[in-house]
Amino acid sequence: DEAGLGYNAWCLAHYGTDRYLNVRPFYPQNFYGGQSPLYTYLLALLIRTVGQGNLSLTLLKIPAVLASLLLFFVGTKSIRLVFDDQKWSIAAAFLLAVCPYYIMSARFALDCNLMLCCSAVALLFFIRFTQTKTLRNLILSGVFFGITMYSYALSYFLIPIFLICISLYLLYTKEISFRRVLLWAACVC
């Protein structure tokens, strides 16, 4: 997967096509299937800017490392917002630091690793919205849920189900108006 992702990103950075000569594909093809566009296009951007047109193993893993670092800070911030206690956020930071999946996700350049980071950022803004009721947090939550849809194919299925369930719950408890749910859905799209 890493090799196919890297080669597609290199081809996109140099020629604007994937390795099968599809011009700027929405859903790039990998060996025996597709791959999510977010990692591919992030890596193509890095190849054009930071890598000066060259692809290296280090450059291939930079998005995964940055996503893992962002997940660490977003995860601890989310726990602090939910529990309103620094002890819980320190415990969450410790658990993230020793979690084998978290450690391995920074080592492999797989597009599925971006889904966890993007959905955590979306949930952080959603938690902030439920606490502050500010429109800015609702819009940012919707935008990041929309970005999550481009991070991994499974999110095409999971994110809409989650958003429908949470919207129905918030409407039932009168925590959100129907107009704001529609705005949130528009931001996801």
Q: How would you name each of these model-derived features?
A:
Residues 60, 101, 107-112, 154:
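Short acidic/glycine- and proline-prone juxtamembrane loop motifs at membrane-interface regions
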Residues 143-144, 159, 166, 175-189:
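Hydrophobic alpha-helical membrane-interfacial segments at the cytosolic entry of transmembrane helices
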Residues 92-97, 145, 149, 163:
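Short helix- or helix-capping micro-motifs
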Residues 116, 139-143, 154-172:
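Transmembrane-embedded, aromatic-rich helix segments that form part
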Residues 14-17, 34, 38-66, 100-101:
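Juxtamembrane segments of multi-pass membrane glycosylation machinery
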Residues 58-83, 121, 125:
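Transmembrane-helix motifs of polytopic, lipid-linked glycan transferases
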Residues 83, 122-140, 148, 169-174:
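Membrane-interface transmembrane helices that cradle and orient dolichyl/undecaprenyl
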Residues 3-31, 38-41, 45:
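Extracytosolic helix-loop segments that constitute the early lumenal/periplasmic catalytic or substrate-binding loops
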